[in-house]
Regions:
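Pre-NBD coupling/linker segments of ABC/ABC-like ATPases
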Residues: 2-29
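ABC family nucleotide-binding domain
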Residues: 29-249
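Conserved beta-strand-loop-alpha-helix hinge in the C-terminal portion
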Residues: 248-266
């Protein structure tokens, strides 16, 4: 009797682990994110909750990855760790060649501001500021000169096809346009990773497709994009889909394979 073939996801994970190095060693520079056996547990109501149970994830520079899973799968916990908003209970997390899993809160904040551009479900725009001023905001905090701020913010808005709406305030923009302003704001510091948490959660299906086209365009330009979602139809836009279940990676497939399975009702 022939041995059962290994699932594609396990083979891919094993290959990634082989090239991303051993514990304690910095991964190859091609890898922008490497987690090694990370766990996260916390106490809730006197019980220990194991949100992540040893996750090995490696993301190359310029990849477009969706992290998907149902409520309670651990995807939000993993997003918080990737975004340097939290630290693992055990294991290693390397971001752009730096081991960030044991950094102080101040050091984490610096890494977060420099390396990660966040896009959230809520747009979090200043209502009385123009699109350009909203995108400039992270550069104000970073002490960048006014001229340079305007140049970089204008470029970021052009990248999301909003060059003609720079002087408009949020209430003069559609929901999709507001989310594009938020994406431009996330891009303005030239982050290593664009980290999007349920970016279409407040949008209708047509506008969601519009935002997915923006992410696809950014990925085609070489931007590393990680998108967290519970919606298979949204995850299917990514080039790679990682599915979490019960705190572990249940599958790790190319977007093409995921779309094929989705079409078959799996």
């Amino acid at each position: 009797v022939s041995a059962p073939s290994r699932p594609e996801s396990l083979t891919v994970t094993a290959e990634r682990r082989a090239v991303t190095g051993a514990h304690g060693n910095a991964p190859d520079k091609d890898w922008v994110i490497v987690t090694r056996a990370i766990t996260r547990q916390y106490e809730m109501g006197g019980e220990i909750v194991r949100a992540l149970r040893g996750v090995d994830l490696a993301v190359r520079r310029n990849e477009y990855v969706a992290i998907m899973g149902p409520s309670g799968s651990g995807k939000s916990t993993l997003m918080n760790l990737i975004g340097c908003l939290d630290t693992p209970s055990s294991g290693e997390y390397w971001l752009n060649g730096q081991q960030v899993s044991k950094m102080s809160d101040d050091a984490l904040a610096q890494v977060r501001n420099k390396e990660i551009g966040f896009v959230f479900q809520t747009f979090n725009l200043l209502p009385r500021a123009t699109a350009l001023q909203n995108v400039e905001l992270p550069l104000v905090y970073a002490g960048v000169s006014s001229t340079e701020r305007k140049r970089r913010a204008s470029e970021a808005l052009e990248r999301v096809q909003l060059g003609s709406r720079m002087s408009h305030k949020p209430n003069e923009l559609s929901g999709g346009q507001r989310q594009r302003v938020a994406i431009a704001r996330a891009l303005v510091n030239d982050p290593s990773i664009l980290l999007a948490d349920e970016p279409t959660g407040n949008l209708d299906s047509q506008t969601s497709e519009e935002i997915m086209r923006v992410f696809e365009s950014l990925a085609a330009q070489g931007q590393t994009v990680i998108m967290v979602t519970h919606e298979p139809d949204i995850a299917a836009h990514a080039r790679r889909v990682v599915v979490l279940r019960d705190g572990v990676i249940a599958s790790d497939d190319s977007g093409e394979t995921f779309r094929s399975r989705l079409g078959q009702g799996h």
